[in-house]
Amino acid sequence: MKEIDKKKEKKVEVLITTVDCKDFNGLLKKMNIQTNAMIGNQTSYNKIDSIDYNSLTIPVYSFNERGVGLNRNNLLMRSKADYCLFGNDDLIYVDGYENIVNKYFCKYPDADVIVFNLDEKRKTRFVTEKDFKVNFFNFMRFGAARIAIKRESILLNGISFNTCFGGGTKHNNGEDTLFLSSCLKQKLKIYAVSQTIAFLSDDRESTWFQG
């Protein structure tokens, strides 16, 4: 794949969703964050703050609310990046993920969404072995933690996460597929690629059903 001129690389931001986080710097380090990021922390209080991390200023939005879709929407509406990754707090990103995201949006210039692979010790998720275009017949196999979006395409088409579905709501899942379904209904272009973007860690108690 053709290398991208560093000066022409577009900005990638990781939108990190977590629940009751007490150590934000530790979270960023554990996730191997190398770019701009934002943290949405669903907890028992309301506070907007920022932390310094590896010469970056990372905004932290702590809100007394629940629902992973709501958490992602709160971050998405505040992002200014060209491309966004939806970062669950159990992900460990590969080195150079910003360059990887740029490479695949360069490879597929009409793409609005790129779906990457997630690596895990026990394979439970669909693994893309050869790049293909995502459509209404195959989109339900993918979750939000493995996708990168062209932020402007999502916002211009009025797409967001359904706040009635997903962790922390009455319906504990489904917000991922509803999001991708909305993208397809708006005729956005989605590609699944064989590149791994992150690893799933298994060293914490999941907060998925809390928020």
Feature roles, as predicted:
Residues 1-38:
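N-proximal low-complexity "stem/linker" segments adjacent to membrane-targeting elements
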Residues 42, 87-90:
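Active-site acidic Asp-centered loop
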Residues 62-79:
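Glycine-rich, basic loop-to-helix element that forms the pyrophosphate-binding segment
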Residues 81, 143-160:
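Conserved nucleotide-sugar donor-binding
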Residues 84:
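Short aromatic/hydrophobic "clamp" motif used to bind/position activated sugar donors
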Residues 92-128:
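Conserved donor NDP-sugar-binding/catalytic core segment of glycosyltransferases
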Residues 161-163, 187-199:
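Catalytic beta-strand/loop signature of glycosyltransferases that borders the donor
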Residues 166-178:
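Acidic donor-binding loop at a coil-to-helix junction in glycosyltransferase catalytic cores
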